[in-house]
Amino acid sequence: MGDKPREKAPRGRAREELCAALVRVVARSGLDGVTYRSVAKEAGLSHGAASYHFATRDEMIQEALLWASRHSIQASRISADGDLEGLAADLPQLMTDYPEEAMFSFELVLASVRRPELASDIRASYYDFIDAVRRSLAKAGFGDNLELARVVFATVDGLSIQHLIYRDRRATEEGVRMLQALLRLALDAVERGEKLS
């Protein structure tokens, strides 16, 4: 971030930079801090860049939510190749490297309780995460188990919140290992023909 806007970025790249900047603005100042001007300044772009790429503030927030969700799913390897050891293994590092994305997401979750117009976007974002977990668990041998995917995602989401509060990487790592151990036990039960519910 600089004080002077830099040269014009390509259209797709500028939108991504604005989304990433919006995430940082929300992490630092909350949703009330989001304006075309604040986001453009954070991105190092001219004020007009934000209004050019996004018709409204809400559209800019919605696009940033989609961007952050895609980035988090890719970076977290949550839809890994079915290896339970890999499931959420990167969470402690991600929370260290990208705490702003988690802060942004949780800020929007809380705001959606007060602002119903955000709720459908939050639900869609959560569904994307749950679906990625569901696919990963299916590859691991659990079959198509949406209920288990919801519980696993809720656990990862909770570990993320706790990491933001306590800033204790070791505790987050232990939480991930415990989740993986519980999933191994559950998979053993499934392989023996037992039902999880």
Q: What residue spans do the PLM features occupy?
A:
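Hydrophobic alpha-helical connector segments
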Residues: E63, Q74-A102, A149-V152, V176
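Helix-turn-helix
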Residues: A14-E17, A21-E59, E63
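Solvent-exposed, amphipathic alpha-helical segments
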Residues: E17, A21-S29, A75, F104, ...
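Amphipathic alpha-helical segments used for helix-helix packing
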Residues: T96-Y126
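N-terminal intrinsically disordered/low-complexity leader segments
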Residues: M1-R13, E191-S197
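Hydrophobic/aromatic-rich alpha-helical bundle segments in the mid-to-C-terminal region
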Residues: L118-A119, R123, A138-S197
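Short, basic, alpha-helical segments at the C-terminal edge of helix-turn-helix-like DNA-binding modules
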Residues: L66-H71
